[in-house]
């Protein structure tokens, strides 16, 4: 992938760390459960109270917006971006104070507005760029996503998250074609990578609210004729309406 900067590597590193933490915590869970079965331990009333705020499955919705700000690293294209999604989460591992959730996001709508740069012939001996704005729409899926919650037994839980997914746009992204460069465009199919954090507020045993920020990257992974990449600072809000 072009423009593979240190910031981009940090996001991949965060996803790797959360994945490793998940497997470690999951292994600890299996060990604890085996010991509990062997000794015939019973679940205490205190643990049952904790479980009221720690159910394994969750359903929710969320939405986010990234304003058009200066690009984060060389080569990325300036853009504004917004998306909404439906989320299924499952708590797959815990430690005493942390919990790991595996999440799947269905994204019915994403919108990006970006700057187009078309090479044109200004005069017989002068080339220039025709710059304007273009909007594209997409839908997609985020099948690989992890969220690491801290203070898992509290009603206010800070968290870290990392995710990888895909978006399919209604047109090639970007599209810089001109008479001088007729093939200067990306692809409709793009990959996404995100990493960040936030705070989850638990209101009762069935509902919670989430406020967060994530670095969000869109790229066709150099499968198109061009791949400038799009980077966004995405602020988002989520609502979990069912836990079971």
Spell out what each predicted region is.
Residues 57-69, 102-110, 160-166, 199, ...:
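Transmembrane beta-barrel strands of outer-membrane/channel proteins
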Residues 71-75, 126-133, 178-185, 221-227:
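Extracellular loop and loop/strand-boundary signature of outer-membrane beta-barrel proteins
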Residues 229-244:
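Outer-membrane beta-barrel "beta-signal"
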Residues 65-84, 188:
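Surface-exposed strand-loop-strand hairpins of Gram-negative outer-membrane beta-barrel proteins
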Residues 61, 65, 84-90, 142-150, ...:
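Residues on the lipid-exposed face of transmembrane beta-strands in outer-membrane beta-barrel proteins
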Residues 47-56, 92-102, 151-157, 203-209, ...:
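Short loop/turn motifs that connect adjacent beta-strands in outer-membrane beta-barrel proteins
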Residues 1-53, 244:
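Cleavable N-terminal export/targeting peptides
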Residues 82-174:
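Gram-negative (and chloroplast) outer-membrane scaffold detector with strong preference
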């Amino acid at each position: 992938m072009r423009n593979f900067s240190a910031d981009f590597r940090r996001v991949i590193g965060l996803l790797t760390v959360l994945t490793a933490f998940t497997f470690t915590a999951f292994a600890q869970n299996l060990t604890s459960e085996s010991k509990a079965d062997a000794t015939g331990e019973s679940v205490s009333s205190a643990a049952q109270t904790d479980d009221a705020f720690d159910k394994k499955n969750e359903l929710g919705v969320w939405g986010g917006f990234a304003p058009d700000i200066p690009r984060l690293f060389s080569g990325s294209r300036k853009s504004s971006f917004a998306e909404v999604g439906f989320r299924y989460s499952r708590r797959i591992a815990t430690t005493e104070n942390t919990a790991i959730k595996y999440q799947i996001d269905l994204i019915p709508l994403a919108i990006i507005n970006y700057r187009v740069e078309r090479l044109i012939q200004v005069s017989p001996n002068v080339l220039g760029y025709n710059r304007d704005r273009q909007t594209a729409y997409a839908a997609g899926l985020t099948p690989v996503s992890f969220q690491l919650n801290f203070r898992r037994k509290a009603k206010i839980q800070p968290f870290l998250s990392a995710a990888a997914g895909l978006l399919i746009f209604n047109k090639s992204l970007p599209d810089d074609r001109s008479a001088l460069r007729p093939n200067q465009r990306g692809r409709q199919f793009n990959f996404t990578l995100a990493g960040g954090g936030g705070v989850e507020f638990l209101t009762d045993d069935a509902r919670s609210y989430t406020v967060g920020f994530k670095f969000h990257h869109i790229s066709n992974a150099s499968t198109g004729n061009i791949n400038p990449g799009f980077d966004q600072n995405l602020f988002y809000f989520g609502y979990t309406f069912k836990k079971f």
